[in-house]
Amino acid sequence: MREKSLILVLIFIFFMGLSVNLLLPTKKTKNISWIASERLSDIDGRILEIKDVSGKRFTIMNFWATWCAPCVEEMPMLSKFYNETKMEGISVVGLSIDSEKNVKEFLQKIKVEHHLLVAGATGTNIMEKIGLNPSNSLPFTIMFDRNYDVQEIKLGKLTSNELLYWVNTAER
């Protein structure tokens, strides 16, 4: 009896997870032009606005934390993608909801070549304001165009194939 209950609970949790992803829009859902003037610090403590690190065509913005295993797994792929596409007007921006201290310690272990901004709790507020991640889960990635129209979103670990698909199928 106890085993049956556990199985039913696990099935329920599985389908709840699926339903959250099904409810998330995946194409140009809203304009987030307000984000352009959000001011955050980079890893060197310089205050930048999001528009300072946005791409001429697209910006891939990845919300992450050092304690999030899938986030850490994505980092090398995001840096590689950035290096391969930055000349095409595509920017990759990691927006950490961690402290600057934790991010600096993390960067001593893993080399990251794309833009990194340290947002702390402000990062969670930005995610909430974007409004496309009801659970505020990580990793959370959005792609927006030069007009700050959201083109794609992904809740969970992202693959390089998904990024390529996003860029190749997005409105130009």
Where are these regions (language model features)?
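N-terminal targeting signals for export/organelle localization
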Residues: 1-41, 172
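Short, small/polar residue-rich loop motifs at catalytic or cofactor-binding pockets
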Residues: 34, 57, 136-138
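A short beta-strand-turn-helix
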Residues: 37-59, 127
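Short active-site neighborhood of thiol/selenol oxidoreductases, capturing the structured segment around
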Residues: 51-69, 78
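C-type cytochrome heme c attachment motif
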Residues: 66-73, 140
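Structural microenvironment flanking redox-active thiols in thiol-disulfide oxidoreductases
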Residues: 73-111, 122-128
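Thiol/disulfide oxidoreductase modules built on the thioredoxin-like
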Residues: 109-112, 119-168
